[in-house]
């Protein structure tokens, strides 16, 4: 397997039943056997479901609610979006049912705002970056790791009812929940690197990454 070099663009694609649900251009920070670490800044190029974009722009909860049925029946449409307001690092290990994100408030001195465990299918690496599928459930963790709370459990349950989250997914997520909490409690990687992650600053001279041509079709792996 070829490693990505720091500074290269890696594309995260969320793929459902062989079709791209979202795509995000990210900067590679480091890559190795333990994990791929990628960064995102305001201005990064994103393809996202139009219902999600509508919700972000208007706050219309009805638009957000429509997203899951559209996902379940394959009728979603994608629109262009630029990442806004926050920067984040994403720690993406192989063969694991979650990634760990560190979100920074760029309006407040690049302060580490929170950790965010995103439950997802194990990644399939591609020439463009990696493919996965967001399983709707998240764990939000305080910057000092002192407390955490589950997020979007109702959405996760609805995804199960609609068949977006399969029973096999659910069984894996139940195990991954316990694994993620143990990592926090035991301050294991990436949380052992808290000081490094707090100190991370992007290169201000580097342009925002863009999505490449063919992002919707190129090198799609097995149906996720």
Identify what each model region corresponds to.
Residues 13-19, 40-42, 106-108, 121-123, ...:
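Short acidic, glycine-rich loop/turn motifs
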Residues 36-40, 111-118, 146-154:
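Short, well-ordered strand-loop elements centered on a beta-strand within folded domains, enriched
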């Amino acid at each position: 397997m070829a490693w990505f070099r720091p500074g290269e663009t890696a594309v995260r694609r969320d793929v459902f039943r062989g079709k791209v649900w979202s795509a995000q251009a990210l900067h590679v920070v480091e890559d190795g056997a333990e994990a791929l670490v990628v960064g995102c800044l305001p201005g990064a190029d994103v393809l996202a479901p139009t219902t999600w974009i509508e919700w972000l722009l208007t706050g219309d909860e009805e638009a957000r609610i429509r997203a899951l049925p559209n996902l379940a029946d394959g009728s979603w449409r994608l629109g262009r979006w630029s990442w806004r307001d926050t920067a984040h690092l994403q720690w993406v290990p192989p063969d694991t049912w979650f990634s760990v994100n560190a979100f920074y408030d760029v309006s407040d001195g690049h302060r580490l705002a929170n950790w965010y465990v995103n439950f997802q299918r194990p990644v399939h690496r591609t020439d463009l970056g990696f493919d996965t599928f967001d399983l709707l459930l998240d764990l939000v963790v305080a910057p000092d790791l002192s407390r955490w709370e589950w997020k979007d459990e109702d959405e996760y349950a609805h995804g199960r009812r609609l068949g977006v989250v399969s029973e096999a997914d659910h069984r894996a997520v139940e195990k991954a929940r316990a694994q993620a909490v143990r990592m926090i409690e035991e301050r294991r990687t990436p949380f052992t690197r808290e000081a490094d992650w707090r100190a991370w600053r992007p290169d201000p001279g580097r342009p925002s990454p863009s999505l490449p041509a063919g992002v919707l079709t190129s090198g799609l792996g097995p149906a996720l």
